[in-house]
Amino acid sequence: MCTFARALAVLCVLVLLPAQVAHAQAPVGYRVSFPTPEHRWMQVEVTFADVPAGPLHVHMSRSSPGRYALHEFAKNVFDVQVKDGRGRPLTPARPNLHQWDVTGHDGTVVVSYRVFGDRTDGTYLSVDATHGHLNMPAALMWARGLEPRAARVEFLPPPGKTWHVATQLFPTGSPLVFTAPNLQYLMDSPTEVGMFTLRTFTIDDGKGPAQTFRIALHHDGTDGEADAFAKDVETIVRETLPIFGEFPRYDGGTYTFLSDYLPWASGDGMEHRNSTVLSSSGALRNPAQRSGILGTVAHEFFHGWNMERIRSRGVEPFDFADANMSGELWFGEGFTSYFDTMITHRAGFDSLTDTLDNLAAFVNAVTLSPGRTFRTAEQMSQLAPFVDAAVSIDRTAWGNTFISYYTWGAAIGLGLDLSLRDQTHGTVSLDDYMRLMWTTHGVPGMKAAPGIVAKPYGMEDLQGRLAQLSGDASFAREFFAKYIQGHDVPDYARLFGRMGLVMRKKAAGKGWLGSAPLVTANGGLRVGVVPFESPLYQAGMAQDDQLVTLDGVDVTSSQTVLDVVAKHAPGAALALKFVRRSGETVNTRVTLEEDPRVEIVPAETTGAAVTPEQRSLRAGWLASRRMK
């Protein structure tokens, strides 16, 4: 993120000069209308009043809160018209693709434009005959220097339609008019405009006023399915609460789940200060999709603490004009991924077997990936602008050089949780660590204006809080040096053993050709990304090469490969014939290895005895804490 832009944003919020106070009393006005929503565009008119003399620099955002890459939202803007307060046309200059510089105004600048949107998710804009699904950076222009000003947003439904509005924006006396105290809050306020099903529930955490939770559900299901979903969401909310001990004081006392489950929606979840966007092409009626949908609910709701209020300095304040880089996403995103796994199990949605399989997936992804030798978890986090829904058309080496900070962070969270429980005989856990981060950074950070976090953290804070919690600065220092800023992984087998669980090879003694994907393309079975040092890599195969024969057997499908490998033990050298994408035929041998992937199972299922202490530690880790 641009250092100057961040410093300016902080200065604008914390040091209001007299002229700025005057400007703050002239809110930026937006009128958002949907004349022909079936054509996938909407009309926006924005009025900047009391504009200082000189050029007004109007921008379309390039990035969006909760995302870290550039998305260049100006690409969908068209038919831009600019006038002054008396209606005189003005011709803006275009210093770049996402900026309009307006001169010659009379203190008022009115910009109108159309913006296209046809992607229902947490990042973009979607307009059709059923709704307007707005992510504000993809929808609304803003002006440099006016960021501290309040905003007034009016929504105008399509002619003849009665559309409603669900948003974290502050309500007014009109159901179609809302406000935001500043640009940061406005851009962080996704909005659903249309006909949706609304469910609400209220929970008192005993620490302040009761908080109201709203579910604005746009789906093609029944009211009964909506009721069941609302009940599941409430269960997740109640299961999450004990981890932190209290809810954030949501602005306005309300938190909103903006949920779009539609055949044309894209799978996504996006956190915001007092709301979240949930989208999927899956249907609530489909039991096979329930776990994934509820896992996203748990993940995004947890972000209301971890990322929205416990916030890294790398993304606070958020820079809408550049990519946002943070070295702490292993914590912000990864620990959240670990906890969404734990919450859905504690809440009763995922079985023990499914949960242990999910945890094993974290461990396998990190311990077996060659990427761990090239970068640390901190460095993987810094790569987010390249991989977080970022768009590129050239091939990369990510399959061999990158591990998602979601996955690696979840594995780190797992290791730290079990380590704390091990060292303290179950009296201290990662729940306590999150609660400490909440009380030392989240709660103090809420003293700023809505949309601003006053006490973001850095790496030194994360390590310092671990030292404080554990009472052992050397433990915290070593943990960070080895597992976060180094390339090591915790001793998961020993840690699981303390919980009465066994981590073992899933296919011990079985031959293994590696994890390169096999796909049928261009008339043959071809390999995808070949992991460094895997059997096929050692044999000289690379992406796009075609398998012809293995052990003398014609390869016609991936099942053929599995059948051949299943007949041999690790160490067997099989004849291999393949054709490089250049057309060269290669005859060689490939040596099978033992499948290194692990699984995690209860010790009692292996015939081993489980001690009372192990059972107690396991129960303390996995049992529900749900507030009734």
Regions found by a protein language model. Name each.
Residues D340, D350-K628:
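C-terminal recognition in membrane/secretory proteostasis and scaffolding
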Residues F34-P35, G66-D128:
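A surface-exposed beta-strand-loop module
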Residues F73-Q81, F116, P148-A166, T179-Y185, ...:
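Zn2+-dependent metallopeptidase catalytic core
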Residues M42-A74, A138-P158:
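Surface-exposed beta-strand/loop patches in extracellular or lumenal glycoproteins
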Residues A19-A26:
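Boundary at the C-terminal end of the N-terminal hydrophobic targeting segment
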Residues S112-F196:
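Extended, low-hydrophobicity, Ser/Thr/Pro/Gly-biased non-transmembrane segments
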Residues A7-A19:
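Bacterial N-terminal signal peptides
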Residues F201-L329:
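Juxtacatalytic substrate-recognition/specificity segment
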